């Protein structure tokens, strides 16, 4: 693994993420989601005409181009004969990421077909992690390496998906009025809250299972394996967020005015992710 490739992959991923967000804004505006009375407009500048739709689309395309240019050096990996080989796995992962960015709220519109949360679960967790590993490692990955990427990414998958789910929980009334199917609008307030609980709590269960596995299989000495429990330090933040979401639901079960859940979940994702990355590095 070479660190300059890791940082370059990180730099290339940022504009692609920005492109996905811009296309999401562009798609929402075209679909009329923000025209529904009572809808919470996360980008009122576009809806009010301060920023044109053409400018949003141009910015999204520009971000994709910048991401592609930054990623060009990553497609070449040193070969055994002293030359360079093409990084085909990275190309496949990059195309999957580009397809996802272009079809979340536009094109196929996975977001409006009740597939937004599972789509984000894998695309912004497993796929992103696999892309960074493929870009950073100079040797071919075996089957066990791909399995490890999948398993290690699962806690991150849950926490990135719950940010989107919290956003959808807030928008249940306006999404239903606009005829949009999201996981939250299909499940209803009670089912959406249960899923919110599951996505928040599963990462901690996975961390505990990981620690148990390390100890049972003696994959690491006990003092070293204890680092696996480091992400549990974020648990009080999760309890506070779940308590807030439950309190709002109990006050008005039919139409709970959930506000700020995505912001709180984003904070948990940041703290947990930082501790999780540190734990993996120390182990």
Where are these regions (language model features)?
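Acidic (Asp/Glu-rich) catalytic motifs at the cytosolic membrane interface
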Residues: 15-40, 161-184
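Intramembrane alpha-helical segments
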Residues: 44-141
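Small-residue-rich segments of transmembrane alpha-helices in multi-pass membrane proteins
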Residues: 118-133, 185-189, 263-276
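Multi-pass membrane catalytic core of lipid/isoprenoid biosynthesis enzymes
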Residues: 36-82, 180-224, 263-272
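Functional transmembrane core segments of multi-pass inner-membrane proteins
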Residues: 120-172, 178, 190-193
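Membrane-embedded alpha-helical segments that form the functional core of polytopic membrane enzymes
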Residues: 1-26, 89-102, 144-166
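Extended hydrophobic alpha-helices typical of membrane-associated regions
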Residues: 212-283
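Helix-coil boundary and interhelical linker segments in multi-pass alpha-helical membrane proteins
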Residues: 1-11, 69-90, 128-154, 205-227, ...
